[in-house]
A protein has these predicted regions:
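Short, charged, intrinsically disordered terminal tails
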Residues: 106-112
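Short, flexible, glycine/charge-rich loop motifs used to bind or transfer phosphoryl groups or to couple energy/partner
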Residues: 2-4, 34-35, 109
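Amphipathic alpha-helical interaction surfaces in cytosolic regulatory modules
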Residues: 20-98
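Short beta-strand/loop segment at the start of cytosolic alpha/beta domains
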Residues: 1-15
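Acidic phosphotransfer microenvironment of two-component signaling modules
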Residues: 83, 105-106
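Short acidic-hydrophobic, aromatic-tinged amphipathic segments that line or gate anion-handling sites
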Residues: 99-103
Length: 113
């Protein structure tokens, strides 16, 4: 799991790549998002274009991060989901929890709305 961070228009974008699985990526994602929230960043976008696999622990990390962000007055959104991740979110009904976007520009604009 590799996480690259960049800021565009006041939104922290985490470009994730690799696997988000138990012991490999799940804690990294949660810790990075917790750090952003602790630093006062409330608008977080996860770019999942390069995530090739996610297991139940990875899903748990996304849900936990979403809940933590919401509790702290922030928002966490997802962009560039692969077909596999879209299907997984649909099967688990989590697609109704997360705001998801196909394009980064659209996702960034949603934070201003």
């Amino acid at each position: 799991m590799d996480i690259k961070e960049r800021v565009v228009g006041g939104v922290s974008i985490l470009d994730l790549s690799g696997k988000i699985v138990l012991g490999e990526g799940d804690m990294q994602v949660k810790e990075r998002i917790r750090d952003l929230l602790a630093d006062g960043q409330r608008r977080i976008l996860l770019n999942l274009a390069e995530v090739n696999y996610i297991d139940s622990a990875g899903l748990g990390a996304l849900i936990s991060s979403y809940t933590t962000a919401k509790r702290d007055g922030g928002s966490l959104k997802l962009v560039n989901l692969t077909k596999r991740i879209q299907d997984l979110l649909a099967i688990t009904k989590l697609i109704t929890v997360f705001e998801t976007f196909d394009a980064e520009a659209e996702a960034l604009a949603s934070f201003s709305a």
